[in-house]
Amino acid sequence: GEGGAPILLPAEPSPLPPLGSVITQTLNWERRHRLMRVHTALHLLSVVMAYPVVGGQIGEVKGRLDFHLPAPPEDIAAIETALNRLIGLGLEVSTRWITAEELAAQPELVKTIYARPPVGKGPVRLVQIGAEDAPIDLQPCGGTHVANTREIGPVRLGKLENKGRDTRRMSLNLA
C-alpha cells in the first residue's frame, strides 16, 4: 500500500469494516510453517543439485524445482541422502540486505534464470544458510524460511521428470 504499508484483504468476499474499526488478524501457523519448511528445503536442493533453476513451486507438503540440466543425474538416492544430510546439520538460516549495485557486482548469487530479483525498488534481501564466513547457500529471496535447517525434518525426493529440452523437474515431499 501507500508508503509500504501492508494491505489486508478479507478471506472471503465481504464488505470491509468501517475505517478505524478494531479487527483481529490471525495467521495459520501450521500451514505457514509447512510452507517455510518446503521453501527452505528447496534452497538446499538447489545446493545439492547445483544447476541453474528455471522454475519452481512451493506447496504445503511438497515443492519442486525445474533445472536447466541436459542430462539427468544417475543417482537420485545419493541426491536425497546428501539433501537430508544438509538438513540434519542444523544450519542457521539468516537474512541480510544488499544494494542493487552490490547484487549487480555479484551475479553468481542469482540461481534463477527467468525469475530475476526485483531491482530498482530499494535494498535486495539475501537469504543465507550456514555460517557467515562459509555459507552453503546465499541468494536473493523474499520468501519465508525456517530459522534452522533441522526444522525442515526429513524429505523424500520424487522421480526426476523430463520437462522438455534441457529441463528436468525434481520434486520433494516432507516425510
Q: Where would I find each of the regions flagged by the language model?
A:
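Active-/binding-site microenvironments in catalytic and ligand-binding cores
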Residues: 1-175
